[in-house]
Amino acid sequence: MASIEAVGAREILDSRGNPTVEVEVLLDDNSFARAAVPSGASTGAFEAVELRDGGDRYLGKGVAKAVEGVIQTIAPAIEGLAADDQRLVDQTMLELDGTPNKGKLGANAILGVSLAVARAAADSAELPLYRYVGGPNAHLLPVPMMNILNGGSHADSNVDVQEFMIAPIGAPTFREALRSGAEVYHALKSVLKKKGLATGLGDEGGFAPNLDSNRAALDLIAEAVSAAGLTLGKDIALAMDVAASEFYKDGSYAFEGGTKTAEQMTAYYADLVASYPIVSIEDPLDEEDWAGWKALTDELGSKIQIVGDDLFVTNVERLQRGITGGQANALLVKVNQIGSLTETLDSVELAHRNGYRCMMSHRSGETEDTTIADLAVATNCGQIKTGAPARSERVAKYNQLLRIEDELGDAARYSGASAFPRYAG
């Protein structure tokens, strides 16, 4: 296999106009690849460290130090290594960093190199990335969990829940699922306009109107599904990312104008699940409310998918704690939360081995990089969260999945309703 000949990096902009890291890798057989790193708005306290420069430049958000770390520290250490030994490349970087949270070199530097090396190795092997990482069994196209209505940290509105998503569960193929989702998205815009509500967009391409309640958001989406000529619960299911850590303070949740305990939040979710075809709730409670998560999982885990994002931060140790303790039944997979491809794949493997579902995810600050689309197929996640069917940094991932589905031909299978406990039988 080809070895790594040169590694370069630069500062580029993400979809929010903030700097991020882009890495380029050249192998000695002239194979070449680049990768760009995403960045989150609502970040878990236990995520790997994203190195930012501070100071006045880019309001303190520059990544010149991370870029310098790639060029001056990481590159000399990995040049000459076999590009197909991903674990060795990643381990070399982790040892160079030497901290538990990648605080020295930065997860943004390490991840950029990790993904670019994988892409270059795939190029050298003359394989698409999903096949290179996932092998011959990588054939499952994910359900697109489309965030079409935004609140919380992703929007300037008075809606507590960060994301209201649609899941096109009734489609026979990914291509048809994408069409269904896009049609509901456009129908929602018309519904909002008709009601005199704002149609401005949040970070991830979803609409961000001011609404009276979180239930009102679900009702609007239900109306849009109907207006698109589709059936709620059959063609389209609903999902939410609550991001509850964002409104948790002093042991209670500041929610819908009052405060709620974990027990009251659980009762609230149970009522929603009984009223709407909700298949998945992400981060329903605070990232350190392990007892609350256990009670909520006991109550709702057999009915719906309960996803740990801030709870697990794609970290095998925190995920193992949840598996042992009975918290959640699914893992949200964000490559930049943990900061290397190897560690990401280890987390997915641990989840799958223990019967936890997985959802591949973007971040709110994205680029045109499509790596996560390939990784969703490579890992047979069956679900991907990469925003609304709008804004090119979101659509880039959907378009890559269309290409993968075409390339797989008859071998392609769309995950559909079987991805979720509510419909899996």
From Swiss-Prot:
Enzyme class label: lyase
Catalytic activities: (2R)-2-phosphoglycerate = phosphoenolpyruvate + H2O
Keyword presence, Metal-binding: yes
Reported cofactor(s): Mg(2+)
Gene Ontology biological-process annotations: glycolytic process
Listed pathway(s): Carbohydrate degradation; glycolysis; pyruvate from D-glyceraldehyde 3-phosphate: step 4/5
Primary role: Catalyzes the reversible conversion of 2-phosphoglycerate (2-PG) into phosphoenolpyruvate (PEP). It is essential for the degradation of carbohydrates via glycolysis.
Classification via HAMAP family: Enolase (MF_00318)
Protein name, per record: Enolase
Species assigned in the record: Nocardioides sp. (strain ATCC BAA-499 / JS614)
Gene that this polypeptide is encoded by: eno
